[in-house]
Amino acid sequence: MRQRLLPSVTSLLLVALLFPGSSQARHVNHSATEALGELRERAPGQGTNGFQLLRHAVKRDLLPPRTPPYQVHISHQEARGPSFKICVGFLGPRWARGCSTGN
């Protein structure tokens, strides 16, 4: 009887050593899953795993809200572009924004 029981016990121990996490799989850390659930509720669609959700939540809390870019009102003359003229000077004709009287 003892010889017949020995191989089954050794095989059971071998299986237990090969798969050590299977006995702990029933115990789930519920606090971690609750934290991820809260992050998913706070930031829907921000990623597929918990790290991306946490990173986006931290970035949103640390950075100030963005302001729209500064807008400058441009006059119609500036919108058409600068008015260049051909000025003839000592070095010959050239493009310039405005001709001075000294050329």
Curated annotation (Swiss-Prot):
Pfam families: Sperm_Ag_HE2. It comes from the Eukaryota. It is found in: Secreted. Keywords: Glycoprotein, Secreted, Signal. Residues 1-24 form the signal peptide. One of its GO terms (cellular component) is extracellular region. InterPro entries: Sperm_Ag_11A_B. Glycans are attached at N29. Belongs to the SPAG11 family. Has antimicrobial activity against E.coli. Plays a role in the defense response in the male reproductive tract, contributing to sperm maturation, storage and protection. This is Sperm-associated antigen 11A. It comes from Pan troglodytes. The gene is SPAG11A.
